[in-house]
Amino acid sequence: MTQEELLKRRPVWEAMSDLFLDTETRWAVPHAARRCADSLYDDEALERIFWAEVFPEAIENLLQVAGDWGMLTLSEPALIKRANHGTIPWLTRRAHGWMVQDSWLATRQVTAWLREFPLDERVQRTKALDLLGRRYFEPPGNACLVASPERVAEVLTIAREEWARYEPVCRAMLGDDETSMPAEGCAAAVRKMLGI
């Protein structure tokens, strides 16, 4: 792997690794998607990077009793080795891929959307999607700590535009065991925040 390729790959590895934290990772989807879109890797390359390089290094964090929840430090030499010669570990993916599958599919979908926009506009779109996701996945009845009036006002127009296509993505990431967060209640909290 050349130094140029390594510089291009590092932000993608880091963003993808956020989907393996032992915390609420669905909030990371817009930021991971932006890094993927900015990288200029095509979908096939991103799929390989995720499953053949990052997944084998990062999945252990979700298999621990108390994994890292702030930031994963992945072995760069191992990532480089996998990038040069690795294959997708099908057995491990089959056994544990479900733990990150929904977030990864959402990341791929949002990556495709963000590619439609110039780099400077992607930042604002990412902020809007982040706000929408944080409000959506906040437990019912909780105040959304990141939805300050200033932050909402900054991205309100974009958030209203994006909500129609981001809501199904968020709904698809709700787990079967999240009965305390019915999809309609989550969506209602977002609509209230957006004033729609």
Whereabouts are the PLM-identified features?
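Small-residue-enriched hydrophobic alpha-helices in membranes
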Residues: 1-8, 32-196
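Short hydrophobic "helix-edge" motifs at membrane interfaces and signal-peptide entry regions
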Residues: 11-13
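Amphipathic alpha-helical repeat scaffolds
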Residues: 16-17
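Intrinsically disordered, low-complexity proline/glycine-rich segments
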Residues: 27-30
